[in-house]
Amino acid sequence: MSEPILQINHLSKTFGSHEVLRDIDFSVNPGDVTSIIGASGSGKSTLLRCINLLETPSSGEILYHGKNIDHIKCGASAYRSHVGMVFQSFNLFNNMSALKNCMIGQTKVLKKSKAEAKASALHYLEKVGMAPYINAKPSQLSGGQKQRVAIARALA
């Protein structure tokens, strides 16, 4: 079996005296589909924020392809280009079309060419069923459609 893409070992996170995550262990292997489920306030978002370098765990380790992500803090943008996250509030730019929302991070953060970013954005918008809405602004989309644009943006 190949090395896990993501390995979480004994991860804990506290905010003051409030323990949000305690001794979390799991791995994600190539081809896996993984769901994180739990009650409201159970730490799902905190776990994802730790994985995406938006929070620092209190203890434990997160390995990405066998490397501890603590050692790649300076390369957070490069790491995040492989580990996407869709927020509960989709954080789409209201003045931009669905297509532009999916391109902006690629051109500004990842420094891809506009042509490359557009091709990637179109590919993922197609995959999530949003190709007919590439020119629509977020105000013209339903909540579910906005979510699909946010997913395409995370994948692109």
Task: Annotate the PLM regions.
Residues 3-156:
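ABC family nucleotide-binding domain
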